[in-house]
């Protein structure tokens, strides 16, 4: 807490156990317009319909999620079981794997088309701001260099790609040993179980 517990105005603060970077567009901004009507509002107010517009942008986005496994389920006075910690992390991984959002009456799929990461001793977001896409091709050389710079990264990094999306899919599979995105999430969950069974 920022003040002693017995003093008024104290606020509980702690650094995040799960960190999410900003989602960064990997392509230049290209907008289009969607024309809408405000028919519902107009009918309720006995007004004329007006045309509204909203911007539409389609792009690949990159973001990084870092999870401090040591701190999951741990607070000042309580600590949940290892099984509960593993369950919480695996639920988060399931959420990311099937991520979507509902907006303006439609559902948008936000699940990953490409994923790279693993469980590492160093608590470092190794791949943050590293993934790039140019001409619908994932920048393999930089990712390969980072993975090969460390024995730990070589051994514990998993790469997944969704088939039929990127033009250099074969290159990604060969050079980064990529498999399906679903298999990567399966491996990550196995790593979570192994971590909590060993601690």
Tell me the role of every PLM-derived stretch:
Residues 1-199:
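Basic polyanion-binding and macromolecular-assembly surfaces
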């Amino acid at each position: 807490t920022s003040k002693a517990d017995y003093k008024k105005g104290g606020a509980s603060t702690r650094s995040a156990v799960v960190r999410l970077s900003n989602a960064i567009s990997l392509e230049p901004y290209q907008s289009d317009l969607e024309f809408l009507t405000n028919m519902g509002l107009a009918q309720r107010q006995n007004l004329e319909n007006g045309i509204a517009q909203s911007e539409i942008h389609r792009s690949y986005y990159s973001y990084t999620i870092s999870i401090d496994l040591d701190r999951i389920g741990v607070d000042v006075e309580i600590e949940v079981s290892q099984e509960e910690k593993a369950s919480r992390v695996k639920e988060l991984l399931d959420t990311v794997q099937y991520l979507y959002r509902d907006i303006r009456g439609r559902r948008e799929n936000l699940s990953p088309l490409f994923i790279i990461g693993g469980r590492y001793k160093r608590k470092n977001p190794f791949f943050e701001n590293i993934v790039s896409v140019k001409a619908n091709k994932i920048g393999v050389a930089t990712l390969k260099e980072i993975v090969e710079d460390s024995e730990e990264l070589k051994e514990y990094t998993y790469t997944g790609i969704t088939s039929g999306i990127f033009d250099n899919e074969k290159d990604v599979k060969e050079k980064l040993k990529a498999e399906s995105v679903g298999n990567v999430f399966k491996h990550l969950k196995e790593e979570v179980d192994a971590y909590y069974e060993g601690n």
